[in-house]
């Protein structure tokens, strides 16, 4: 799962990124509403953590706009605005939860988990490709009824490939899914994790699309 963090306070942003990674989530971070909207258009996210005091636009206006565009992913507002009126306004415009700064990281983690569970229960919580089943709420993967033990990076790669099963995924998209896990990623980071993932799901199942990226197929015979 991948989280989009929209926060213009650099110090807090770094802390939020670290907190997300510690919990096993990949994340992208932006500092303006415009950049956030561009990220939503270009990527696939499971949740947005949104500050309201953005430099280019009020976060409530941004939230209202993305809801009008039919983005249904859960949004957690993270803000210093602490009045009842502020909270009601945020929830009414489309937020799924509202957390006031300062906050405890444990509470933030719990609220994110609750939002993801709720969202997954409302829609498709499982991805199924051949005999592979990925439960997005539990972050578990089974192959032929047997649970696979994956690292967080392997899980991030497999979930992306399963979402686009049968279609090639560009290596840059896959690289971005795991980039945040490494402070100084090497040039072969992606290849190493693809190799390890192939050992677990079947070598011929993840195919190299020369000059582009990788593609997951339903079984090794396809």
From Swiss-Prot:
Effect of residue 29 to G: In strain: ECOR 1, ECOR 10, ECOR 11, ECOR 12, ECOR 13, ECOR 14, ECOR 15, ECOR 16, ECOR 17, ECOR 18, ECOR 19, ECOR 2, ECOR 20, ECOR 21, ECOR 22, ECOR 24, ECOR 25, ECOR 26, ECOR 27, ECOR 3, ECOR 30, ECOR 33, ECOR 34, ECOR 35, ECOR 36, ECOR 37, ECOR 38, ECOR 4, ECOR 40, ECOR 41, ECOR 42, ECOR 43, ECOR 44, ECOR 45, ECOR 46, ECOR 47, ECOR 48, ECOR 5, ECOR 50, ECOR 51, ECOR 52, ECOR 53, ECOR 54, ECOR 55, ECOR 56, ECOR 57, ECOR 59, ECOR 6, ECOR 60, ECOR 61, ECOR 62, ECOR 63, ECOR 64, ECOR 65, ECOR 66, ECOR 67, ECOR 68, ECOR 69, ECOR 7, ECOR 70, ECOR 71, ECOR 72, ECOR 8 and ECOR 9
Maturation and modification: Phosphorylated by BasS.
Pfam family, one: Response_reg
Entry's Gene Ontology cellular component terms: cytosol; protein-DNA complex
Residues bearing PTM 4-aspartylphosphate: 51
Induction, per UniProt: The eptA-basRS operon is positively autoregulated by BasR under high iron or aluminum concentration conditions.
Residues spanning the signal sequence: none
Cell compartment(s), UniProt: Cytoplasm
Keyword Transcription included in the entry's annotation: yes
CDD domains to which the protein is assigned, alphabetical: REC_OmpR_PmrA-like, trans_reg_C
UniProt cross-references to Gene3D superfamilies, sorted A to Z: 3.40.50.2300, 6.10.250.690, Winged helix-like DNA-binding domain superfamily/Winged helix DNA-binding domain
InterPro entries reported for this sequence: CheY-like_superfamily, OmpR/PhoB-type_DNA-bd, Sig_transdc_resp-reg_C-effctor, Sig_transdc_resp-reg_receiver, WalR-like, WH-like_DNA-bd_sf
Any one GO molecular-function label of the UniProt entry: phosphorelay response regulator activity
Residue ranges constituting the Response regulatory domain according to the UniProt record: 2-116
GO biological process, one term: phosphorelay signal transduction system
SUPFAM superfamilies: C-terminal effector domain of the bipartite response regulators (SSF46894), CheY-like (SSF52172)
Subunit organization: Homodimer.
Note: The activity of the BasR protein is in some natural isolates, but not in strain K12, controlled at a post-transcriptional level by the PmrD protein under low Mg(2+) concentration conditions.
Function as written in the Swiss-Prot or TrEMBL entry: Member of the two-component regulatory system BasS/BasR. BasR induces the transcription of the ugd, ais, arnBCADTEF and eptA-basRS loci, all involved in resistance to polymyxin.
The protein's name in its UniProt record: Transcriptional regulatory protein BasR
């Amino acid at each position: 799962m991948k989280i989009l963090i929209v926060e213009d306070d650099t110090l807090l942003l770094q802390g939020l990124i670290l907190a997300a990674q510690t919990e096993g989530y990949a994340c992208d971070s932006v500092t303006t509403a415009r950049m956030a909207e561009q990220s939503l258009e270009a990527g696939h996210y499971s949740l947005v953590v949104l500050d309201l005091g953005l430099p280019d636009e009020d976060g409530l206006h941004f939230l209202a706009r993305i809801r009008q565009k039919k983005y249904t992913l859960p949004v957690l507002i993270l803000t210093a605005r602490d009045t009842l009126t502020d909270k009601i306004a945020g929830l009414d415009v489309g937020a799924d939860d509202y957390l006031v700064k300062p906050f405890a990281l444990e509470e933030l983690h719990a609220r994110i988990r609750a939002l993801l569970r709720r969202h997954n229960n409302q829609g498709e919580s499982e991805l199924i490709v051949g005999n592979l089943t990925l439960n997005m709420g539990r972050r578990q993967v089974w192959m032929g009824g047997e649970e696979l033990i994956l690292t967080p990076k392997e899980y991030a790669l497999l979930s992306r490939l399963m979402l686009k099963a049968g279609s090639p995924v560009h290596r840059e998209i896959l690289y971005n899914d795991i980039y945040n896990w490494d402070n100084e990623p090497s040039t072969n980071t992606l290849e190493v994790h693809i190799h390890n993932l192939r050992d677990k799901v079947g070598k011929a199942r993840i195919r190299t699309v020369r000059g582009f990226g990788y593609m997951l197929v339903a079984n090794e015979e396809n």
